[in-house]
A protein has these predicted regions:
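Membrane-interface amphipathic segments in extracytoplasmic regions
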Residues: 2, 31-457
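Small-residue-biased low-complexity repeat regions
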Residues: 5-6, 21
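Intrinsic disorder/low-complexity segments
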Residues: 6-8, 28
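Plant-biased recognition of short, low-complexity, intrinsically disordered N-terminal tails
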Residues: 20, 27-30
Length: 457
């Protein structure tokens, strides 16, 4: 796993990085000593055998007379990690889904948890589509009445702490996710090329051309302009057009984010982020298993960003760059506090559990497919434009039986899952309210009385 410049140097660990993950490091070499004489070896072997018999007899005696249980020691090289504090799972979560940061995958994890535990998820009113009328500031008025009061919220919105606190339970845990600004901006430029006016103006849809003179294309007052400038700051409720030379603005925004969110995840270290999330919420490892969603096809991705272009992206999105640098550093401080060896061991356990789940659902690692090749329309991801292709997954053909709901939801895209939850929760809301009361009969209308006056002539 590569690390950006903000990652601290690695600590000594029984794990070492390899292509595709972490593997156990080899044990240290044993020092060589001269062989013992044969007679000494025989005496040593007898003593060892006698000692083993005594230990075995003592253990059996304890088991028979005291009902003791065997306690197996941890495997050699495994980190000694403290057990989490006992307590119930947290059942109220507000996730600020930022743009192009692996937020769709986090959202899917939260949707599945809420559905399994019969918890209400706040969903947008139909005029807002599957987002809470973004890019407007969030308002509780945008929440569908059949999804109130909610325990979870995880769809796109522009953060407003006061409105969310008014909507969500008092014990809600607030989390969000950030991504390295260069990779994020390249993804934004490709994904929203036909939506953001600043991107549409660029000749040949060239990111390098845009960055040569971004002010020539960018108009702050236009709809969807925020995709072209400091999008993370905008999503978090900040002023994405604030002068980065103001030395007081970014530290103030950082303090607000730290006060609002119990955890800021980092997309580049997604599995480590899920370990911290699981611990924060006191969830099980199975609660945070996932398959990557809303990915671009290889031909829709850039071939990497040249160093000069990367510097231009950071300069143009200076507020986002400063925000990410701060929370990347605090993220690794949390990892170190939790014990890096322990976190990496849990990452390995998470990946092994995920592999078992996808093996059960797909018979192996699922292969991303273009939407046109996915048979089940409920699994076809939304396509933002003809210029970019978003891939999804299809379940393997079965025996005609309905697909396993657990596997279906694991790869269900955001739009379809949101609509499914809205239908399900609307039905539940109507059942709770009961049938509508019968209509009250209106006043009885008498026929008009015949007039005794002569007709006008």
């Amino acid at each position: 796993m590569g690390a950006p410049g903000g990652r601290p140097p690695p600590l000594p660990s029984p794990w070492r990085p390899e292509q595709g993950g972490w593997v156990a490091a080899p044990p240290p070499a044993m020092a060589c000593t001269a062989p013992a004489p044969p007679r000494a070896l025989k005496m040593l072997s007898r003593r060892r055998a006698l000692l083993l018999l005594l230990l075995l007899g003592s253990s059996l005696s304890l088991l028979l007379h005291r009902g003791a249980h065997l306690s197996w020691p941890p495997k050699s090289g495994a980190p000694a990690c403290p057990s989490p504090a006992p307590g119930p799972k947290r059942m109220a979560v507000a996730f600020l889904k930022t743009h192009k940061t692996a937020g769709s995958t986090v959202q899917n994890i939260l949707f599945r948890f809420a559905e399994r535990h019969n918890l209400t998820v706040a969903l947008p009113h139909p005029p807002c589509d599957h987002q809470f009328c973004y890019p407007r500031d969030f308002s509780a008025r945008y929440v569908h009445p059949h999804t109130r009061p909610p325990a979870f919220i995880a769809s796109h919105l522009r953060f407003r702490a006061a409105e969310l606190h008014r909507l969500m339970p008092n014990d809600t845990v607030y989390v969000t996710i950030l991504r390295e600004p260069v990779a994020m901006f390249e993804s934004l430029f490709t994904y929203y090329n036909q939506y953001c006016p600043a991107f549409r103006r660029v000749p040949n849809a060239s990111l390098a051309t845009f960055l040569e003179e971004p002010r020539a294309y960018y108009r702050p007052q236009e709809k969807y302009a925020m995709y072209a400038h400091n999008t993370l700051v905008y999503d978090l409720g900040g002023d994405n057009d604030h002068d980065p030379a103001d030395a007081t603005y970014l530290p103030g925004l950082i303090r607000q984010v730290e006060d609002a969110f119990a955890l800021v995840m980092i997309a580049e270290y997604f599995d480590e982020s899920l370990v911290l999330l699981r611990r924060l919420l006191n969830w099980d490892l199975d609660d945070v298993l996932y398959v990557k969603l809303n990915m671009r096809a290889p031909q829709s991705r850039g071939n990497g960003t040249a160093p000069g272009v990367a510097a231009q992206v950071r300069a143009w999105n200076a507020l986002d760059a400063g925000l990410y640098a701060h929370f990347n550093a605090t993220f690794w401080a949390r990892i170190n506090h939790a014990g890096r060896d322990c976190v990496e061991a849990e990452v390995q356990a998470l990946r092994a559990a995920r592999d078992r789940l996808v093996g059960t659902c797909f018979g192996g690692r699922p292969q991303p497919r273009p939407a046109t090749q996915i048979r089940n329309k409920e699994l076809r991801p939304w396509q933002p434009s003809a210029q970019v292709e978003i891939v999804g997954y299809d379940l393997p053909p079965g025996s005609g039986a309905p697909p396993d709901p657990r596997c279906l939801k694991l790869v269900m895209p955001e739009v379809q899952y949101s609509r499914y939850l809205l239908r399900k929760q609307s039905l539940r809301s109507r059942r709770r309210r009961g049938p509508p009361p019968p209509a009250r009969p209106g006043p009885r209308l008498l026929p008009p009385r015949r007039s005794l006056l002569p007709k006008a002539t």
